[in-house]
Amino acid sequence: MSSQKSSHHKADSKMEQDNNRKAWISQPSGLNFVWGGDSRYWVIPKEPRMPAELKMVSWLEVTGSFDKIEPGKTYRIGFKISFKPDATGWDKAPVFMSAKIGKKGKTVWKRIKSVSQNFGILKGGSEPVNIPDESDGLFEILVSPTALNQDTKLQFGLYEVWTGRWKTGLLIHEAFVQEV
């Protein structure tokens, strides 16, 4: 039986604790990328601390999970991104983040307007930025205090799947989860 390579990249590492930032960090190899298994669309680095590079997609879906959460606590979720100077397709792209607790949890969505609003500045070679930024407001999710014996894995993602437009040049440096 032959093994067939997937068109998608499945996370292959766990989140690491960053005590300085009081956060848990996922490098690109620890995230799931739709179309990430195909080098025509994404370059997923094998080396730590290197960003994943979007070559081109019309369906952006990058997801991760975190299982070290505690009932009754609130968690802040975000991504650190930048753009290549020749990036395209982001000026009118409605980028969203989502989060939910457990497979059956209610999904919470947040539009990340700062990506399209600041695209011209971001693709000018600036340093990586956290999204959502202050203009978007923080993205936080509360784990129910009664969730003790339930599935409490935090699942989160970054999406732009609605326009069908091609997007290029996004660099994803990391995803992070911070206890508030």
Curated annotation (Swiss-Prot):
Basic and acidic residues: bias regions: 9-21
Sequence segments annotated as region (Disordered): 1-21
Superkingdom of the organism of origin: Eukaryota
Protein name, as recorded: Protein PHLOEM PROTEIN 2-LIKE A9
Source species: Arabidopsis thaliana (Mouse-ear cress)
Record-linked Pfam families: PP2
One Gene Ontology molecular-function label: carbohydrate binding
Taxonomic lineage of the native organism: Eukaryota, Viridiplantae, Streptophyta, Embryophyta, Tracheophyta
UniProt xrefs under InterPro entries: PP2-like
